[in-house]
Amino acid sequence: MDRFNCILNDTEYIYYLKRNKKFEKDRKFCKHNLKHFLDVARIAQLINLEESLGFNKEIIYTTAILHDIGKSLQYENGTPHEISSWEISKEILHNYRYNEEEIEIIKQGILGHRDKKSENFAQLMYRADKLSRLCISCKSIDECNWGDEKKNFKIYY
């Protein structure tokens, strides 16, 4: 988990984390912050262990902290955040010596985390991302654009 922890302290990573916070300052719906990222990581790792999927813990955690890192660019210029998150992540991953195989897995997780039909690692990230949202206690649930079929009214992890 050394590389993962280095990313958490990376100047560029912190810059985009702060940008997300700035753009979501007045947002009343789910935020795209470190708490969300770590919720996704922990849920994905629990699913990984429960279902014996065999994914590497550091790859799961790394993907989770990067999957929404470009959300501010979606607010700013309309770029889908999975695309901007991947663009930001590429250089960061190379800086901390992730190998090409690891980078490809992380890429699939970031780019596929919004696609219900995604497979393998991307499907794990999709599931964890959705399960991380606490709709059951949300004060803005009635205004949320998620349909009831998507909202979490139960806690699984």
Swiss-Prot record:
| Gene3D superfamilies, alphabetized | Hypothetical protein af1432
- One Pfam family cited in the UniProt record for this chain: HD
Q: Which residues belong to any copy of the HD domain?
A: 33-134
Per its UniProt entry, which superkingdom is the organism in?
Bacteria
Q: What NCBIfam families does the database record attribute to this sequence?
A: HDIG (TIGR00277)
User: What is the protein named?
Assistant: Uncharacterized protein Cbei_0205
Provide the organism lineage as a comma list.
Answer: Bacteria, Bacillati, Bacillota, Clostridia, Eubacteriales
